[in-house]
UniProtKB/Swiss-Prot annotation:
Keywords, in A-Z order: Amidation, Secreted, Toxin
Secreted is among the record's keywords: yes
Species for this entry: Cupiennius salei (American wandering spider)
GO molecular function list: toxin activity
Keyword Iron annotated: no
Subcellular location: Secreted
Stated name of the protein: Short cationic peptide-4d
GO terms (BP aspect): defense response to bacterium
Matches recorded under InterPro entries: Cupiennin
Length: 20
């Protein structure tokens, strides 16, 4: 189950958006 990987990617994506 890749839910953890997906969650990590989502968090990383959101974090990047917040940094801009």
């Amino acid at each position: 189950f890749l839910a953890k990987n997906v969650a990590k990617k989502l968090v990383s994506h959101v974090a990047k958006k917040q940094l801009e």
